[in-house]
């Protein structure tokens, strides 16, 4: 479905699929466009459950669903395009696409609809090069004379009060190789409840399965809450009120860092130079693909070093 927007102001469309982390790492693009073109309406074509974060943070005027059936023919040669989508693409002064489109089929089809300028951006960094993902995603904006975009993803949500005395923990990921062992997490939860005044918010989605319930089993229920399967637009403000965050190499960790939380990342086998969350309050514990060897003591020291805001 195409969301209605103003037809008066010039419009820029940023097309971004991918998972939560991919989108968060593209927020600097939206911020740079907004700063460079303050009178332009910036819109996103992506997955609304993720891209709606840009609406909440004031980085986009509208979000349109990339999974719309009417878009399917734009990925085929010689397709018969939906009239509504032809008119939609033709209304933009600039279209910036981060889709994987090696044969330029999508690019060719969108160009035929009449946007003034189409910029084909790299959909994923080359991990053989020591360049952070956000810098890779900002690079195409040089075609718009934007050379100084801030690579730090920042998401400011309006109307939030002081941060509560809560520490958010995300003990899972989409890959077991990225996870600190579950038993270690259980020991960490017990330690924090016994030796700190912090309340704990365990967050997760489908990837965590029953892990959160297992970690909470037998713990002090009045100081521990589980937030699982909560839509991002609802989870983000709840997360933003926490004093800090501990998690793995995940999209949720990128979200916490973008929200400005003191963030401790238990890093696994991924390329840290390319994929780590950026920010003044981010600390990374990297065991160089041997995450299981990361000790409880080291993690507790890392949490203490975050200088959490407590009330």
Give residue ranges: language-model regions.
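Catalytic machinery of carbohydrate-active enzymes
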Residues: 1-311
């Amino acid at each position: 479905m195409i969301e209605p927007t103003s037809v008066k102001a010039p419009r820029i469309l940023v097309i971004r699929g991918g998972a939560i982390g991919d989108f968060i790492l593209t927020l600097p693009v939206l911020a740079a466009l907004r700063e460079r073109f303050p009178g332009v309406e910036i819109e996103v074509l992506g997955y609304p459950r993720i891209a709606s974060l840009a609406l909440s943070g004031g980085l986009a005027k509208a979000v349109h669903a990339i999974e719309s059936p009417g878009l399917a023919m734009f990925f085929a040669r010689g397709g018969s395009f939906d009239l509504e989508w032809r008119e939609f693409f033709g209304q933009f002064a600039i279209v910036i696409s981060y889709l994987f489109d090696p044969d330029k089929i999508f690019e060719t089809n969108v160009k035929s609809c009449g946007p003034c300028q189409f910029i084909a951006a790299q959909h994923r960094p080359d991990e053989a090069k020591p360049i952070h993902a956000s810098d890779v995603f900002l690079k195409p904006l040089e075609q718009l004379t934007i050379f100084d975009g801030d690579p730090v993803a920042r998401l400011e949500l309006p109307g939030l009060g002081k941060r509560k005395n809560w520490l958010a923990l995300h003990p899972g990921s989409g890959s077991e190789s990225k996870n600190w062992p579950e038993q270690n997490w259980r020991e960490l939860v017990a330690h924090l409840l016994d030796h700190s005044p912090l309340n704990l918010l365990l967050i997760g989605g489908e990837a965590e399965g029953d892990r959160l319930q297992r970690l909470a089993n037998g713990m002090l229920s009045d100081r521990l809450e589980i937030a699982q399967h909560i839509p991002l637009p609802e989870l983000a403000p709840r997360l933003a009120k926490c004093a800090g965050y501990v998690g793995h190499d995940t999209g949720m960790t990128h979200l916490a860092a973008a929200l400005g939380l003191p963030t401790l990342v238990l890093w696994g086998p991924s390329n840290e130079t390319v994929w780590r969350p950026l920010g003044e309050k981010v600390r990374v514990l990297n065991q160089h693909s041997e995450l299981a060897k990361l000790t409880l003591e080291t993690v507790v020291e890392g949490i203490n070093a975050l200088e959490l805001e407590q009330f």
